[in-house]
Amino acid sequence: MRLIAGVLAGFLVICEVTSTSESDRTMAYQTADTDNTQPTGAVENSIASKQFLRTDVVMNRGEERGFEALKKLLPGTKIVAKDGASFSGAFVRKMLGNNAFRNQEFKRWTRSDLDGTALRQMLGDMNKKGRTELLNRYTAFLGPKDGLVYHKPGPIV
C-alpha cells in the first residue's frame, strides 16, 4: 500500500513538473508575440492600468536615450570616441587647451600606470590634429625613461 502511494505521489510530481516547464515555454513564446504588457488583472492593487514589462528588445529607444543622457553626467564618458577604442577629438582639444586639466589627467594616468605605448594606442590615428602633440607632452611629463620613445606621425606598428 505504501509503495503504491509513493509511486503515485512520484508520478504526480513528475507530471506537474513536466506541465510547469511546458507552460513556461508556452508563456515565453506568448510574451514574445505580444506587445510586452502586463495584464491589468495581475496587478496587486487592482487598479486597472497598462504596465510594460522589461525586455532586452528596446521598442521605442526611449530607454536608450535615457541611458545616453545618464552617461553624459558621469565623468569620463566623452573621453572615448564613437569607435570605443580611441580618444575623442573634443577630449584631445580639451587636453591641449587647458593646462590644469591636462596636468590633472596626466597625474591620473601616471597613477594608473599608463605608459606612452598604451596612450599611443588610445590616441588612434596619429595623423589627426593634436594627437602627436598630446603624446609628446605626456612623454615629456613622464620624463626620460628607458624604452620611452617620442612619436613621429605614422601608423601604429
From Swiss-Prot:
Species this chain originates from: Phytophthora infestans (strain T30-4) (Potato late blight agent)
Show where the record puts the motif RxLR-dEER.
51-65
Name recorded for this polypeptide: RxLR effector protein PITG_04049
Name what induces it. Expression is induced during host plant infection.
Question: Secretion signal: which residues?
Answer: 1-23
Q: Which Pfam families match?
A: RXLR
The function of this protein is: Effector that might be involved in host plant infection.
- InterPro entries noted in UniProt: RXLR (IPR031825)
GO CC terms in record: extracellular region; host cell cytoplasm; host cell nucleus
Where found in the cell?
Secreted; Host cytoplasm; Host nucleus
